[in-house]
Amino acid sequence: MKLNKNSELKLSTIDEKEKNLRPETLKEYMGQKNLKEILSVYIKAAKKRKESLEHLLIYGPPGLGKTTLAKIVAKELNVNFKITSGAAMERSGDLVATLSSLQMGDVLFIDEIHRLPKSIEEILYSAMEDYVLDIVLGTENEKKSIRIDLPPFTLIGATTRFGDISSPLRDRFGLILKLNYYSEDELELIIKRTSLVYNTKIDNNTLKKLVKRSRGTPRIANRLFRRIRDFADVYNKGLIDEHISEIALEKLTIDKNGLDDADYTYLKSLIEKFEGGPVGIKNIAANIGEEVSTIEDIYEPYLLKEGYIKRTKRGRIATPLTFKLFKNDKIK
């Protein structure tokens, strides 16, 4: 299907708005005040010494801006930014090709760095420490080792699973930064900025309700804003108010606590199938038909933060808050 000029213009406008949502400098990056101050010092020091920034590991829950922050670092350093992921690195040749293409001072960003295969991870060690690649060529009987010099570069790794990063890899990062959940005040500023980008008004009461449902996460806040905006455009002449937001959030099955259907399925399973626990994560995953990694990375961080569950050596346990949520007085 061919797009006419009007359609192409609309798509271009949408892309531009999406781009404008993403901050491009540390000054524009909202929240994470202490982290920004520290990172700013590191960047200024590296530029003053005309050196590459030390390798940086960023960790924290999904949706807090790890990729955006990595892009900002490259922009602040005025260097090229290259991106890949741990899952995409299936063979040693993939990493060798990527590293060999780097220029002086480049930032190489590896998302989900905890998913790097061990054999590929080990190639990074000499690259990070000495800016060299040691490669073994040939067959089992006739092996030949060659060394390739690399220009100084900065590796930025991002992970939602800090504990899964091996000690040898973790120790090679000179800088390690943690992204924390955003405060309600910070999320208000982010949503207000988003409303300006989209030229869509939002009243104060609706703003606060949206913040409550954003789970301390900018990505969720912006996604909810866009979905409510869809309803406002169709049913309310583009105005986001309490009435239209309630309709949208009800359709999206997101309650006042920020819990959605997936959260309720998890918590209901924990209470009804396993009597509140303790129960192993694999049993919960099998019961609700979900991957263990998805539960650990997507569901549980917020449920733990808000006090709906606890992790113990014996397994997951539902808290009194969860039983109250389901109006069950039989608290184990």
Swiss-Prot record:
Alphabetical keyword list: ATP-binding, Cytoplasm, DNA damage, DNA recombination, DNA repair, DNA-binding, Hydrolase, Nucleotide-binding
Binding annotation for DNA: R311, R316
Cellular component annotations (GO), alphabetically ordered: cytoplasm; Holliday junction resolvase complex
Residues binding Mg(2+), per UniProt: T67
Subunit text: Homohexamer. Forms an RuvA(8)-RuvB(12)-Holliday junction (HJ) complex. HJ DNA is sandwiched between 2 RuvA tetramers; dsDNA enters through RuvA and exits via RuvB. An RuvB hexamer assembles on each DNA strand where it exits the tetramer. Each RuvB hexamer is contacted by two RuvA subunits (via domain III) on 2 adjacent RuvB subunits; this complex drives branch migration. In the full resolvosome a probable DNA-RuvA(4)-RuvB(12)-RuvC(2) complex forms which resolves the HJ.
Protein name from the UniProt record: Holliday junction branch migration complex subunit RuvB
Superkingdom per UniProt: Bacteria
Gene3D superfamilies per the UniProt record, alphabetical: 1.10.8.60, P-loop containing nucleotide triphosphate hydrolases, Winged helix-like DNA-binding domain superfamily/Winged helix DNA-binding domain
Keyword ATP-binding: yes
UniProt-annotated location(s): Cytoplasm
EC number(s) recorded for this UniProt protein: 3.6.4.-
GO MF annotations in UniProt: ATP binding; ATP hydrolysis activity; four-way junction DNA binding; four-way junction helicase activity
InterPro entries the UniProt entry points to: AAA+_ATPase (IPR003593), AAA_lid_4 (IPR041445), DNA_helicase_Holl-junc_RuvB (IPR004605), P-loop_NTPase (IPR027417), RuvB-like_N (IPR008824), RuvB_C (IPR008823), WH-like_DNA-bd_sf (IPR036388), WH_DNA-bd_sf (IPR036390)
Chain segments carrying region Small ATPAse domain (RuvB-S): 183-253
Record note on domains: Has 3 domains, the large (RuvB-L) and small ATPase (RuvB-S) domains and the C-terminal head (RuvB-H) domain. The head domain binds DNA, while the ATPase domains jointly bind ATP, ADP or are empty depending on the state of the subunit in the translocation cycle. During a single DNA translocation step the structure of each domain remains the same, but their relative positions change.
Catalytic activity: ATP + H2O = ADP + phosphate + H(+)
Head domain (RuvB-H): annotated segments: 256-332
A GO biological process held by the record: DNA repair
Region (Large ATPase domain (RuvB-L)), start-end ranges: 1-182
Family: Belongs to the RuvB family.
Function (record text): The RuvA-RuvB-RuvC complex processes Holliday junction (HJ) DNA during genetic recombination and DNA repair, while the RuvA-RuvB complex plays an important role in the rescue of blocked DNA replication forks via replication fork reversal (RFR). RuvA specifically binds to HJ cruciform DNA, conferring on it an open structure. The RuvB hexamer acts as an ATP-dependent pump, pulling dsDNA into and through the RuvAB complex. RuvB forms 2 homohexamers on either side of HJ DNA bound by 1 or 2 RuvA tetramers; 4 subunits per hexamer contact DNA at a time.
Positions of ATP binding: L21, R22, G63, K66, T67, T68, E129, D130, Y131, R172, Y182, R219
